């Protein structure tokens, strides 16, 4: 697979479309196994990325379900961009809050596509892998553009550290998670 942003087009190619439609059910049925394998693989190769993920959601499988759900929803609703806009906006906001950079999409794409082949084996032919690579990069390019607009609005650079903030509320969200309500200091903004 090419593993480069699909900036040359914004729609799924006619060769990829039937492959995606035919394989969505198989990938949905194996989505959690694929994404769990993906996270393990990516964190083994890039342990520095662990701090971007809620490890409680990793352990529970919520993160794996969220990633699988987002990619498959995108693949099945690509012809109705308005359907995916609210979810993509939420994902972009979350990514900006974490300082996600465009370069990190290459890492994610590489490990996600490799995980498809490693979990599903021979069922993932080169043509099917290329079709899913295309879907991934269409979604990634969309998210990168949304995130760029948010960064521009905030006058931040992608990956920029958060400004100093004031904690105005602290509450236990679960046994191992604390939720903080933050307030920007004068002259600063939050995503």
Model region roles, listed by residue range:
Residues 1-10:
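Short, Lys/Arg-enriched N-terminal segments with co-localized hydrophobic residues
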Residues 156-191:
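Ferredoxin-reductase
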Residues 11-162, 167:
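Globin-like tetrapyrrole-binding proteins
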């Amino acid at each position: 697979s090419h593993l480069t942003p699909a900036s040359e087009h914004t729609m799924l190619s006619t060769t990829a479309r039937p492959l995606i439609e035919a394989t969505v059910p198989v990938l949905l049925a194996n989505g959690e196994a694929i994404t769990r394998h993906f996270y393990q693989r990516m964190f083994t190769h890039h342990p520095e990325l662990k701090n971007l993920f809620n490890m409680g959601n990793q352990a529970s499988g919520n993160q794996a379900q969220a990633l699988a759900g987002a990619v498959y929803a995108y693949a099945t609703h690509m012809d109705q961009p308005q359907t995916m806009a609210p979810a993509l906006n939420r994902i972009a906001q979350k990514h900006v809050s974490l300082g996600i950079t465009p370069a990190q999409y290459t890492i994610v794409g590489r490990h996600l596509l490799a995980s498809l082949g490693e979990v599903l084996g021979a069922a993932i032919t080169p043509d099917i892998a290329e079709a899913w690579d295309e879907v991934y990069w269409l979604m990634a390019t969309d998210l990168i553009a949304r995130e760029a607009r948010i960064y521009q609005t905030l006058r931040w650079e992608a990956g920029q550290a958060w400004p100093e903030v004031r904690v105005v509320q602290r509450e236990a969200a679960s046994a191992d998670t604390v939720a903080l309500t933050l307030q920007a200091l004068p002259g600063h903004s939050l995503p």
